[in-house]
Every structure is written in structure tokens, then in C-alpha cells.
């Protein structure tokens, strides 16, 4: 007879969702301030496509890197999530210190995309460690958090129309750091977390 499913603390799913929302808010951070960059950096309207493509390219490369090296299997997924969140937030804020040229923006966006591979997919892995039963519903909830997270920069820009674009960047980086800290301090490894070919309950 298989052991009963342990109860999942009520905070787990909302905390993972909040952490995912904070981390994925960096995805379209630059798009939300595109008009500001055109004005202050003398960039053209075509830069939004290049910036978005840089994020996607970074995510693809990052996903391959994390997968091929099995980063989330070799190390604690929570630690991977925290470090990835911190590095993505740093890449986002780095644009404030770099020369005001398109290369600076695309390079930092590529970095964000790369480290998002340690946020969104790894967050899903952390959730799967808690929800052997009802995993589909939990993952659906997290997909909703992803959608809200990617829309957050635009909502933030709409609410803070008088804010300098630099403040928008800093707020989004702060949210990403907060998401990483939430995951690290409030979400322990789940009983079904698969690591090294076996779940925690099998070891």
C-alpha cells in the first residue's frame, strides 16, 4: 500500500506563484520603457523587436545550458532559483550603468533571458516536488502567474507614468530579487522532488 500523500502547506502554491510573478516580470521590462529609450537614447522604433528577440534568444540558450548541465538536478532547485533571480535582476539593473546604446540593452536583455531559464522552468520543477496529486492544477496556476508577470512591466509603467524609466527598471529588479528570496526562505524542497533519479520520498 503506497504511503498517503502528505498535506501540502497552504502557503506553498501562492508563494511559488508570487515568486514566479516577480521573476518573470523582467521578461518584457525593456518593452515597457521603449518610448522612453527612444527619447533618451535616441533609439529607433525598430529597437523593440531587437530587444524582445534578445530575451528570447537568451532564454533558448539558457534553457539548453541548464538542461545539458542538469543544473537543477545537481544543485538544489531553490538555490538555482535564488541565484538565477539575483543574476537576472542584476542584468536588468546593469543597463543603468552601461553606455546608452542598443548593444547595452540587447546584451542585458540576453542575460535576463538566459537566467529566466533558471526561474520559470525551475519554478515548475519546485512545484512538481510538492504536487504529485493535483499537479496539473498547480502548474496551470503557475502559468497564470507567468502571464501576469510578463504583463506586469506594462501595468507598472501605466500606473507610474510620471516615473523615470530608471525607477521602473529598479522596481522590477527588486521584484525579481524578492521572488528569489520568497522561494528560498518559504518553499522547502517538496517530498516528490526528483533529484538524481529518485524523489525525496524514495530516498
Show which residues each predicted segment covers:
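Juxtamembrane intracellular "pre-TM" segments in multi-pass secondary transporters
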Residues: 2-6, 189-203
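Helix-loop-helix hairpin linking two adjacent transmembrane segments in secondary transporters
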Residues: 133, 141-192
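Residue-level signature of mid-helix packing/kink "hotspots" within the transmembrane helices
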Residues: 28, 55-64, 150-151
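Hydrophobic core of transmembrane alpha-helices in multi-pass small-molecule transporters
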Residues: 21, 91, 102-118
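Extracytoplasmic
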Residues: 11-45, 63-66
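Juxtamembrane helix-start elements in MFS-like secondary transporters
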Residues: 43-52, 101, 139
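Conserved MFS/SLC helix-loop-helix module at the cytosolic interface between two early adjacent transmembrane helices
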Residues: 63-102
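Cytoplasmic helix-loop-helix junction between adjacent transmembrane helices
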Residues: 108-145
Amino acid at each position: 500500500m503506497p504511503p498517503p500523500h502528505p498535506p501540502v502547506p497552504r502557503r506553498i502554491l501562492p508563494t511559488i506563484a508570487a515568486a514566479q510573478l516577480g521573476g518573470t516580470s523582467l521578461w518584457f521590462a525593456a518593452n515597457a520603457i521603449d518610448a522612453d529609450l527612444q527619447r533618451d537614447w535616441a533609439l529607433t522604433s525598430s529597437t523593440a523587436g531587437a530587444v524582445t528577440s534578445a530575451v528570447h534568444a537568451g532564454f533558448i540558450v539558457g534553457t539548453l545550458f541548464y538542461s545539458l548541465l542538469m543544473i537543477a538536478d545537481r544543485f538544489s532547485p531553490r538555490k538555482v532559483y535564488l541565484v538565477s533571480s539575483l543574476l537576472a535582476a542584476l542584468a536588468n539593473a546593469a543597463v543603468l550603468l552601461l553606455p546608452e546604446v542598443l548593444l547595452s540593452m540587447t546584451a542585458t536583455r540576453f542575460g535576463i533571458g538566459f537566467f529566466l531559464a533558471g526561474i520559470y522552468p525551475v519554478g515548475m520543477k519546485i512545484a512538481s516536488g510538492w504536487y504529485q496529486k493535483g499537479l496539473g492544477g498547480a502548474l496551470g496556476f503557475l502559468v497564470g502567474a507567468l502571464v501576469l508577470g510578463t504583463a506586469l512591466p506594462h501595468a507598472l509603467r501605466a500606473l507610474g507614468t510620471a516615473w523615470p524609466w530608471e525607477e521602473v527598471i529598479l522596481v522590477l529588479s527588486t521584484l525579481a530579487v524578492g521572488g528569489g528570496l520568497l522561494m528560498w526562505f518559504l518553499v522547502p524542497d517538496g517530498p516528490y522532488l526528483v533529484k538524481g533519479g529518485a524523489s525525496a520520498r524514495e530516498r
